[in-house]
From Swiss-Prot:
Protein name: Sterile alpha motif domain-containing protein 3
Organism: Homo sapiens
Region of interest called Disordered, as start-end residue ranges on this chain: 85-114
Domain of life: Eukaryota
SAM domain location: 4-71
Family annotation (InterPro entries): SAM, SAM/pointed_sf, SAMD3, SAMD3_SAM
C-alpha cells in the first residue's frame, strides 16, 4: 500500500464501499503512503461523516496489522484479498468461540445479530452487502464486560497525566474521541443504549477520578456524550429511519416546531414575568438570555451553566420562596428541568449528594423491603420474581431489585402509591410524581418526572428517577402530600443521616402471627 498512487487508493476505497470519499481523496492527492500516515485528527478533517471515519480508521489499522512481517503487495486488489482472507479466518474463529453458543450473556457493546433492527443509520452504513465480513472486521472491537478506553491524542494524554481540570475545548475533544470510538463498536449506529453510555462514562471516571468534579461528574460527562451524539445525528434528522425512531420514542409526538407568533408570545410572557416577580438588573437579564439560548443548543457548555446557575441561585431562591409560578421559573431557568442541575441545586442547599444517597438506600434496603410482609404478594413483587428467573447476570438482577424497591416504597409504609409512581395510567396529581414504563427491561425502560401534570424530564434508571423526585420537592419547595409522608420520612431520614429505620421481615412477621404460605 505504501507505493500506491492516488488512483489505486481511490480504487481501494470503492472496493471497501467508501466510494463517497473518492472525490475528497483526489482533491487532497492522498497516495498510499499518505493514507498510512493519517492520524485520527487528519481523518476527522478529511472525512465528513463519523461512520466513514470509524470504518476508514479501522481498515487502515487492520491493514497495518495484517502486513506486519510481510511484503506489502503493490496491487490493491491483492491487499484487499489478504485482508478478506484474514477476516474470514477471524470470523470462523469467532463462530467457534462465540459466547452465544455456550449460553453466555453478550456484553452491552456486542454488535447485534439483526443489524437492520431500526437503530442503524442507513446513511452512514451504505451498501452493506455482507454481514459476516462486518462481524469479522469488528472482531477486534468486541468488548469485555468492562469498557476499555481508547488511545487519546497526545495533547489529551498530557492533560490527563497532569490531572489538570480540562477547559471547555479540551472537554469537547475528549467527548468527540469517545463518541467516535463508541461508533466503531456500534457498527456505525448513532443510537447507543443507556447501559452503553454508563459503561463509557464509568470507565472514564475510574481511569481518571479527578474528572469527577464534586461527585457530579458522571452526569456531566454522560450529558455531554449524549449531546455529542445528538449533534452528529443532526445532519440526518430528516432521514425516514431517524423520523421513525423519533416517533417510536415519543420525540415531539408528531408536533411541528413553534410558529413565530408562539415564539413572540413566549418572549412577551417572559418580559411580564420579569416585571412582576422582582427587579431584574442588567447582569441577571444577561444570564437569563444566555440560559435560554444555551438550552436549545445540542452541545452545551456545562461548566459555564454550573457557574451561571450558582451566580443566580439567590434570586432564584427568592422567586421560589415568593411563590412565583413554577412554569414561569422554569422558563427563566430551563436547566432546572435537568436532573443533574436539580441534584446540584439540592447539594448547594443541603450540602448532600442526593444521587449517591439514593443509590445507597436502594442497594442497602432492597432485600429488607422486598421481603417485608406488606409487599410479599404485591403484583410488582410477583412480576419481579418471575423476571428474575430468566437472568443470571448479577448486575441485571441487582438493577431489577433496585427498580422494584423504588416502585414498592409507598406500599411498604402504607402510603398512597398513586402519589408516588404511575404505571400505565394518565398523571392526575399536580405534585411531583414518577411515570414508569417497562420497569424491568433495562434496554427500553423509561422513567419520567411530572410536575403540575406536565413532564419535567425523562431519566434513564430508577436511582436517578427517585433522586429527582425527592430533589423536586426540596428544590421547588413543594409540600409533601400527607398520604406520602411515611415514605418521604424514611427517605429523608437516610438522606440526611438521621438514623436507620427498621423493617419487620416476612420471617419475623410469620413468627408473630403464625402466618403460613399457601401450598402450591
Amino acid at each position: 500500500m505504501e507505493t500506491w498512487s492516488v488512483e489505486q487508493v481511490c480504487s481501494w476505497l470503492v472496493e471497501k464501499n467508501l466510494g463517497e470519499l473518492v472525490h475528497r481523496f483526489q482533491e487532497e492527492e492522498v497516495s498510499g503512503a499518505a493514507l498510512l500516515a493519517l492520524n485520527d485528527r487528519m481523518v476527522q478533517q478529511l472525512v465528513k461523516k463519523i461512520g466513514h471515519q470509524a470504518v476508514l480508521m479501522d481498515l487502515i489499522k487492520k491493514y497495518k496489522q495484517n502486513t506486519q512481517g510481510l511484503k506489502s503487495p503493490e496491487n490493491p486488489k491483492k491487499a484487499a484479498l489478504v485482508m478478506q482472507t484474514e477476516a474470514a479466518r477471524d470470523y470462523r474463529d469467532e463462530e467457534s468461540s462465540s459466547p452465544a453458543r455456550h449460553g453466555e450473556q453478550m456484553p452491552s457493546f456486542y454488535p447485534a445479530e439483526n443489524l437492520d433492527n431500526g437503530l442503524i443509520d442507513q446513511r452512514v452504513l451504505k451498501q452493506r452487502r455482507n454481514v459476516k465480513q462486518i462481524l469479522a472486521r469488528s472482531k477486534a472491537l468486541q468488548w469485555t464486560k468492562s469498557y476499555v478506553l481508547p488511545e487519546f491524542p497526545y495533547d489529551v494524554k498530557c492533560m490527563l497525566a497532569e490531572q489538570k481540570c480540562p477547559d471547555h475545548s479540551m472537554r469537547i475533544r475528549i467527548i468527540e474521541f469517545l463518541q467516535a470510538d463508541m461508533t466503531k463498536y456500534l457498527e456505525g449506529s448513532l443510537y447507543p443504549s443507556t447501559q452503553q453510555y454508563n459503561d463509557v462514562v464509568n470507565a472514564l471516571l475510574q481511569a481518571h477520578p479527578f474528572l469527577d468534579e464534586d461527585g457530579c461528574g458522571f452526569f456531566l460527562w454522560k450529558r455531554a456524550l449524549k449531546d455529542r451524539f445528538k449533534y452528529v445525528r443532526r445532519p440526518i434528522e430528516d432521514d425516514e429511519q431517524v423520523i421513525r425512531n423519533k416517533c417510536k420514542f415519543g420525540h415531539r409526538r408528531g408536533q411541528t416546531r413553534k410558529s413565530l407568533a408562539d415564539i413572540r408570545f413566549d418572549e412577551i410572557k417572559l418580559v411580564q414575568i420579569k416585571e412582576e416577580a422582582v427587579c431584574f438588573d442588567s447582569e441577571l437579564d444577561e444570564h437569563i438570555k444566555w440560559f435560554q439560548q444555551e438550552y436549545v443548543k445540542t452541545e452545551k457548555d456545562w461548566r459555564e451553566i454550573d457557574k451561571r446557575m450558582s451566580q443566580t441561585l439567590e434570586i432564584r431562591r427568592k422567586m421560589i420562596g415568593s411563590r412565583t409560578p413554577l412554569k414561569d421559573i422554569l422558563k427563566l431557568f430551563p436547566f432546572l428541568k435537568c436532573p443533574y442541575q436539580m441534584f446540584r441545586e439540592f447539594q448547594l442547599l443541603t450540602r448532600t449528594d442526593i444521587y449517591k444517597k439514593t443509590r445507597h438506600i436502594l442497594e442497602s434496603y432492597s432485600e429488607n423491603i422486598l421481603t417485608s410482609f406488606s409487599v410479599v404478594d404485591n403484583p410488582i413483587n410477583i412480576v419481579l420474581q418471575e423476571k428474575m428467573k430468566h437472568y443470571t447476570d448479577e448486575d441485571m438482577l441487582k438493577y431489577m431489585k433496585m427498580t422494584a424497591t423504588c416502585l414498592l416504597l409507598p406500599d411498604v409504609f402504607g402510603d398512597d402509591p398513586s402519589l408516588f409512581v404511575i404505571m400505565n395510567e394518565q398523571v392526575q396529581v399536580s405534585t411531583p410524581v414518577l411515570e414508569v414504563k417497562n420497569p424491568f427491561n433495562m434496554e427500553v425502560c423509561e422513567f419520567s418526572l411530572y410536575l403540575e401534570r406536565e413532564r419535567l424530564t425523562k431519566v434513564d434508571d430508577c436511582v436517578t428517577a427517585l433522586a429527582a423526585l425527592v430533589a423536586a420537592f426540596h428544590v421547588f419547595r413543594i409540600e409533601c402530600p400527607r398520604r406520602l409522608s411515611q415514605t418521604f420520612n424514611f427517605l429523608e431520614t437516610l438522606i440526611f443521616d438521621m438514623h436507620s429505620p427498621y423493617f419487620p421481615s416476612l420471617k419475623e412477621k410469620e413468627n408473630e402471627v403464625g402466618f403460613q404460605h399457601p401450598l402450591t
